[in-house]
Amino acid sequence: MSQKILFIDRDGTLIEEPKSDFQIDTLEKLRFEKDAIPTLLKLKKFGFKFVMVSNQDGLGTPSFPKENFEIAHEKMLDILKSCGIEFQDIFICPHFENENCVCRKPKTAMLEEYIKHELYDKEQSFVIGDRESDMILASNLGVRGLKYGELSWKEIENEILSSFRSASYQRTTKETDIKVKVCLNGGKVSIKTGIDFFDHMLEQIAVHGGIGLEISCKGDLEIDEHHSVEDVALALGACIKKTLGDKIGIARYGFALPMDECLASCAMDFCNRPHLVYKAKFKKSHLGALSTEMIEHFFYSLSYAMGVSLHLKVKGKNDHHKAEGLFKAFAKALKMAVKIESENLASSKGVI
């Protein structure tokens, strides 16, 4: 099973590297880099596993006795363990660069089992290190590299937590072919469903929800818009759900009450018990090429695909504004509900 793994360099990244001899061979030389421990603790709560990958030039030679190395190394591991941080694997290459061994970073021989058995999720794993060789290792593993020194540990934390809140989803049937990409932290907005008014409504979700949203839909519009609207809702809901993963840290609940000349409200709970309460009446049968009855069906399909309990209500005179109000209210509630506000799961059950 693929895991979210951080492949972490040791010297100069996790602990300070002495510029005099580049060896941590005494306890006096052992110092942790600023914010390394609190960052790893936080990332651990979001399901990341840790693997250490380090080059130790000449380890075991007279200039760098193994017993001297192990005194500081074991102390480092003891301190980390006492804080709640453990490495599931530690890989150390003891060779000099001129020995041209098969294991030295950025070569991947030490990580052969991880590659062979696909033990890491390429989209959600990272290499963290302070040297260019670490960045090349990241490329060789097919993951993103984060260079310590150019980034602080807190900036690395932010980069990691923001990057995994995105996902892509494709739904293909005999009636529609839909591709969706969602980035909860913002990004490109491009929506093409073939139904102009529907595109305008979906754009409200992106703009007012502060999310990146790309949707392309090729559907059987020669029949009517039903299949396209329904399947876009199912694909979008599944994609949003995918971005949240195990939902650790999210607020879970959202509520919005935007007002124009109409009053729209939305309450949302990522409870994994899909339900829709919908109260809206329209005078027109269509807004552009979108049937107004399909607005309710869109939110019904969306709520079930997302796994949310959703309450939507709108009152007003202008049908266009009422429809827009519903989508804006949904967007604002979504923005609130998916916000990371803690390091825990918002449930006494331990699962949502």
Swiss-Prot record:
Transmembrane region(s): none
Pathway note: Amino-acid biosynthesis; L-histidine biosynthesis; L-histidine from 5-phospho-alpha-D-ribose 1-diphosphate: step 6/9; Amino-acid biosynthesis; L-histidine biosynthesis; L-histidine from 5-phospho-alpha-D-ribose 1-diphosphate: step 8/9
Segments of this protein annotated with the region Histidinol-phosphatase: 1-164
Catalytic residue list: D9, D11
Keyword Cell inner membrane on entry: no
EC nos: 3.1.3.15, 4.2.1.19
Keywords (A to Z) from UniProt: Amino-acid biosynthesis, Cytoplasm, Histidine biosynthesis, Hydrolase, Lyase, Magnesium, Metal-binding, Multifunctional enzyme, Zinc
GO cellular component terms given for this protein: cytoplasm
Gene3D superfamilies: HAD superfamily/HAD-like, Imidazole glycerol phosphate dehydratase, domain 1
Subcellular location: Cytoplasm
Record-linked InterPro entries: HAD-like_sf, HAD-SF_hydro_IIIA, HAD_sf, His_synth_bifunc_HisB, HisB_N, Histidinol-phos, IGPD_sf, ImidazoleglycerolP_deHydtase
Residues reported to bind Mg(2+): D9, D11, D130
Source taxon at top rank: Bacteria
GO BP field: L-histidine biosynthetic process
One MF term in the entry's GO annotations: metal ion binding
Region named Imidazoleglycerol-phosphate dehydratase: 165-352
Catalytic activity line of the entry: D-erythro-1-(imidazol-4-yl)glycerol 3-phosphate = 3-(imidazol-4-yl)-2-oxopropyl phosphate + H2O; L-histidinol phosphate + H2O = L-histidinol + phosphate
Residues that hold Zn(2+) according to the record: C93, H95, C101, C103
Known cofactor(s): Mg(2+); Zn(2+)
Claim: Cytoplasm is one of the keywords in the record: yes
Family: In the N-terminal section; belongs to the histidinol-phosphatase family. In the C-terminal section; belongs to the imidazoleglycerol-phosphate dehydratase family.
Protein name: Histidine biosynthesis bifunctional protein HisB
Organism of this sequence: Campylobacter jejuni (strain RM1221)
